[in-house]
Amino acid sequence: MSDPKYAYPYPAPGNYPQGPPPPVGVPPQYYPPPPPPPPPPPPPRKVGFLEGLLAALCCCCLVDECCCDPTIICFD
């Protein structure tokens, strides 16, 4: 009996109280509930007037520098 696998004796035979049965109509809980759905993605950001204006000005300045400079030949 000094062997570690026999550290606890077997329980005595007999009836053991198991508690009341579960209520009728309630399914047993075998699996954990599913995780909540992820939050929706944020709405797309709208470009404001000032940002669009600055982009247009930069584009115009770039085109002016590249295409209106007589030292740069774009077409033959």
Swiss-Prot record:
GO terms for cellular component: cytoplasm; plasma membrane. Mostly expressed in stems, siliques, leaves and flowers and, to a lower extent, in roots. The keyword DNA-binding does not apply. It is found in: Cell membrane; Cytoplasm. It is a single-pass membrane protein. The chain crosses the membrane at residues 47-63. Residues 19-45 are annotated as: Disordered. This is Protein CYSTEINE-RICH TRANSMEMBRANE MODULE 11. The gene is CYSTM11.
